């Protein structure tokens, strides 16, 4: 790629800066880490790898990067694309072959959403492989919009206020998942992917499914953002600014013990002169 335009340079710097801030804020990568970068062939994971490779060069710490792709044996999957791309970059990589496609097609009725089962099978396989290669961190390409969408999905359909944290220790206790693009918008990532002309691999398994719950939420947020620019960022900031005493979760705040403080200074209000 030739010389970047002013706007392209700003975009690249913004993504690198935001990823660096997220990594620092959540202590995602530490000196000596071996980071397994999960590469799906989509715009998000390509951008994540690109940004991490840059940060690896300029960071004050030393860490390894190993790219890993999972070949789920989907029909028409272009097996040559990622190896060719990663060889050209000179990045260490592994292709993990696991026929989860057949499992998903067998267990999920025709017309039903495959995303949930597919994701669980893929995640379990990657956790195991991360352990095998001694990876200390597993990097996923989820961005700010993914995190906000997940928050609303859980609220609307699961009755829970939870999202997709920038850093997570897996239930097995042996894997730490990080999301370096947590502060980055999907719009910026899409623009960067277009600019870099990454060799995108579409998902034949779920990409053609319509009316997914996530797509409904995504469309809602896009419409909100169109009418009120900055709303998605505001919602994301809210996830970083939780006030348990202003919600209703008894496990997070002790409401049962609340009572007046006899030693508190009385507040007098002259209601007649308001």
Curated annotation (Swiss-Prot):
Cofactor requirement: Mg(2+); [4Fe-4S] cluster
Q: Which GO terms describe its cellular component?
A: cytoplasm
Where can this protein be found?
Cytoplasm
Gene Ontology terms for molecular function? 4 iron, 4 sulfur cluster binding; ATP binding; magnesium ion binding; sulfurtransferase activity; tRNA binding
The free-text cofactor remark is: Binds 1 [4Fe-4S] cluster per subunit. The cluster is chelated by three Cys residues, the fourth Fe has a free coordination site that may bind a sulfur atom transferred from the persulfide of IscS.
User: Family, per the entry?
Assistant: Belongs to the TtcA family.
Oligomer and partners: Homodimer.
Q: What is this protein called?
A: tRNA-cytidine(32) 2-sulfurtransferase
- Organism (species): Pseudomonas putida (strain ATCC 47054 / DSM 6125 / CFBP 8728 / NCIMB 11950 / KT2440)
| Lineage per the UniProt record | Bacteria, Pseudomonadati, Pseudomonadota, Gammaproteobacteria, Pseudomonadales
**Gene name, Swiss-Prot/TrEMBL:** ttcA
